Swiss-Prot record:
<dbReference type="InterPro" id="IPR014721">
    <property type="entry name" value="Ribsml_uS5_D2-typ_fold_subgr"/>
</dbReference>
<dbReference type="GO" id="GO:0006298">
    <property type="term" value="P:mismatch repair"/>
</dbReference>
<dbReference type="InterPro" id="IPR013507">
    <property type="entry name" value="DNA_mismatch_S5_2-like"/>
</dbReference>
<feature type="region of interest" description="Disordered">
    <location>
        <begin position="335"/>
        <end position="411"/>
    </location>
</feature>
<dbReference type="Pfam" id="PF08676">
    <property type="entry name" value="MutL_C"/>
</dbReference>
<dbReference type="InterPro" id="IPR002099">
    <property type="entry name" value="MutL/Mlh/PMS"/>
</dbReference>
<protein>
    <recommendedName>
        <fullName>DNA mismatch repair protein MutL</fullName>
    </recommendedName>
</protein>
<dbReference type="GO" id="GO:0030983">
    <property type="term" value="F:mismatched DNA binding"/>
</dbReference>
<dbReference type="InterPro" id="IPR014790">
    <property type="entry name" value="MutL_C"/>
</dbReference>
<dbReference type="GO" id="GO:0032300">
    <property type="term" value="C:mismatch repair complex"/>
</dbReference>
<keyword id="KW-0227">DNA damage</keyword>
<dbReference type="InterPro" id="IPR020568">
    <property type="entry name" value="Ribosomal_Su5_D2-typ_SF"/>
</dbReference>
<dbReference type="InterPro" id="IPR038973">
    <property type="entry name" value="MutL/Mlh/Pms-like"/>
</dbReference>
<dbReference type="GO" id="GO:0005524">
    <property type="term" value="F:ATP binding"/>
</dbReference>
<dbReference type="GO" id="GO:0140664">
    <property type="term" value="F:ATP-dependent DNA damage sensor activity"/>
</dbReference>
<dbReference type="InterPro" id="IPR014762">
    <property type="entry name" value="DNA_mismatch_repair_CS"/>
</dbReference>
<keyword id="KW-0234">DNA repair</keyword>
Length: 628
């Protein structure tokens, strides 16, 4: 049999078999074209499940008159010009087959106008002849595409369409997927003249949670964990079903790569593996969005672009796994560590995180301006809204060290009255709590101390503990105590050798010529610090670091360390000071710092007590009374 070239109409119908599977496929291709055109609103109208009519209207950039006919031909696109463009593609469409394929199996009308044109133009194309007629029309800036009588010229394909209800369900499901990815777009859907979906732009987090509730259900929106993680060129964001709310298999499973919805077994495996430590056999719900360098992912794998191929699939898998595990671990810790916010809280606040702590008599210093504060409210707020956040390390609230002023400013009148009340207040006994304590691994040594934690004194101005002894009132700097406790913890662990924590994603940096010699000469010191380094293919691989460096920028910190130890072998005191500086944000509440202080030896406690500053409260009260 002789080889013959297929006629254009037959070739387009064959291509349509891959691209146009059902009405939902048509809507997918047309809406993606609208988004590529920069539309901020997309209106979808269908009749009889899309078999009778599909109309997509947008406010995008439009198509010039001279390009209308070309837009309906095969392999015509404005998305790319060369192979390099394909390797770095970020748009939804790029093959130039959608409009040609749709017009070959339907009666298609394309109306469009650009901002530069004074009038719109309309292109008509029918599947039989593939001839395009261009006529003037009335239309605002943007485009409208109508596909009438889908599969009218391919009866076999039309017979395979399901009921109107089933086809509408497929369309509705696809719209949910794209609405989750493009929160900035206003989507509407009409079926048989009735508006059934109206997704308004979700420009704030609260609005997006509302959209999440519309699409994924109220239960998912109320219990999901916020994911926000960035490492090098990878960024993962979205929402994950809470382990406490997950059960069985969830249909809410959406994964996007650079804004494109894909089906990938890699992410499903990472999610199930992350959940395996809480419950076996759970396939939880998630809405996850991965952003990465387009050169690191191939989207030209499937005709319908449902699949992608990662150049470093194992690296992406481990990255997603670590981000999800960190988010779930943090949510578990927050549920234990953080009490509901009271109406009046101070900057340093007690919480049952490290042991039973007596209630404090808080002093409202809302009018004062402390130089630095440590706010548990901020921690709770950011954790509940942002979940996991970090650049390769675990979530960490920020402790802003208080500045050490040589003089204490005069307190407010409210504080003076509170000082007097403190003197007449009976001591409060330590109360037990039913909340199970689960200290982090790096605090295990601190928790095993034999020293008991006394009741924590009140906190004032977000910076100081108020110490009352007989008729004396003193202020003890919390930041100073936290620093001393941290140094004591490091010193105790350094004496035995700090146990390094392996990085799930090792950090690689270009190696300097003298680094191999430094690592070899200082191997004992690095092992004592819990740091494991290796050199391979001209790269320095950071495999393990002590817990005090987990939140540091290792790519910059480790070279500085190597340069430091190259010149001299530092003393233990210098190493302790350096580690303490890197882990300045160690304690995340006043109660943690107080518990660490209580675990210090008596002589160290006395020395720190001696650094407290006595307040001349009697003089202030006399002056206050004389003023009256």
């Amino acid at each position: 049999m002789a080889i013959e070239k297929l006629p254009p109409q037959l070739a387009n119908q064959i291509a349509a078999g891959e691209v146009v599977e059902r009405p939902a496929s048509v809507i997918k291709e047309l809406v993606e074209n609208s988004l590529d055109a920069g539309a901020t609103r997309v209106d979808i109208e269908i009749e009889k499940g899309g078999a009778k009519l599909i109309r997509i209207r947008d406010n995008g950039s439009g198509i010039p008159k001279e390009d209308l006919s070309l837009a309906l031909s095969r392999h015509a696109t404005s998305k790319l010009k060369s192979l390099d463009d394909l390797e770095a593609i970020l748009s939804f469409g790029f093959r130039g087959e959608a409009l040609a394929s749709i017009s070959s199996v339907s009666r298609l009308i394309l109306t469009s106008r650009t901002a530069e044109q004074t009038e719109a133009w309309q292109a008509h194309a029918e599947g039989t002849e593939m001839a395009v007629k261009v006529l003037p029309a009335a239309h605002p800036v943007g485009s409208t595409v109508e596909a009438v009588d889908l599969f009218f010229n391919t009866p076999a394909r039309r017979r395979f369409l399901k009921s109107d209800k089933t086809e509408f369900t497929h369309i509705d499901e696809w719209l949910k997927r794209i609405a989750l990815a493009r929160r900035d777009i206003h989507f509407t859907l009409k079926h048989n003249g009735k508006t059934v979906r109206n997704y308004r732009p979700a420009n704030t987090e609260i609005q997006y949670i509302q959209r999440l509730g519309q699409i994924c259900g109220k239960a998912f929106a109320e219990t999901c964990l916020r994911i926000e993680c960035e490492h090098n060129d990878l960024k993962l964001s979205g929402y994950l079903q809470s382990p406490s709310a997950a059960s069985g298999y969830s249909e809410t499973q959406y994964f996007y790569v650079n804004g494109r919805l894909v089906k990938d077994r890699l992410v499903n495996h990472a999610v199930r593996q992350a959940f395996s430590q809480y419950a076996e056999g759970i396939s939880p719900g998630y809405v996850l969005m991965l952003e990465l360098d387009p050169h690191q992912v191939d989207v030209n794998v499937h005709p319908a672009k449902h699949e992608v191929r990662f150049h470093q699939s194992r690296y992406v898998h481990d990255y997603i796994l670590q981000a999800l595990q960190s988010a779930m671990a943090q949510s578990t810790q927050l549920s234990v560590d953080i009490e509901p916010e009271s109406e009046q809280t101070t900057a340093w606040q007690t919480s049952p995180t490290r042991g039973a702590v007596a209630p404090s008599h808080y002093v409202d210093e809302s009018k004062s301006k402390p130089s630095a504060v440590f706010d548990v409210r901020e921690r709770h707020s950011s954790a509940s809204q942002a979940g996991y956040s970090g650049g390769g390390g675990s979530y960490r609230s920020q402790l802003k060290p208080a500045s050490r002023n040589s003089e204490v400013s005069l307190p407010s009148q409210t504080s003076i009255r509170a000082y007097g009340e403190l003197l007449s207040t009976d001591s409060v006994q330590t109360q037990s709590t039913n909340v199970p304590l689960r200290p982090a691994a790096h605090q295990a040594g601190m928790m095993s101390t034999s020293h008991g934690a006394a009741s924590m004194p009140p906190v004032i101005a977000g910076q100081y503990w108020v110490l009352v002894k007989e008729d004396k009132i003193s202020l003890l700097d919390i930041a100073m105590v936290a620093k001393a406790a941290l140094k004591a913890e490091i010193a105790a662990k350094l004496a035995q050798g700090i146990i390094g924590q392996p990085l799930l994603m090792p950090v690689a940096i270009s190696v300097d010529d003298d680094w191999p010699e430094i690592i070899d000469n200082r191997e004992q010191l690095l092992r004592k610090l819990g740091i494991e380094l290796s050199i391979r293919l001209g790269q320095l691989i950071i495999k393990k670091v002590p817990p005090y460096l987990r939140d540091s920028q290792l790519a910059a910190l480790i070279p500085e360390l190597l340069e430091w130890i190259r010149l001299e072998l530092p003393s233990d005191a210098a190493v302790i000071k350096w580690l303490a500086e890197q882990a300045a944000n160690r304690f995340t509440s006043a109660s943690e710092a107080w518990f660490a202080f209580s675990a210090l030896p008596d002589d160290v406690q006395c020395e720190l007590y001696n650094h407290s500053q006595e307040l001349p409260w009697e003089q202030w009260m006399k002056e206050n009374q004389s003023d009256r």
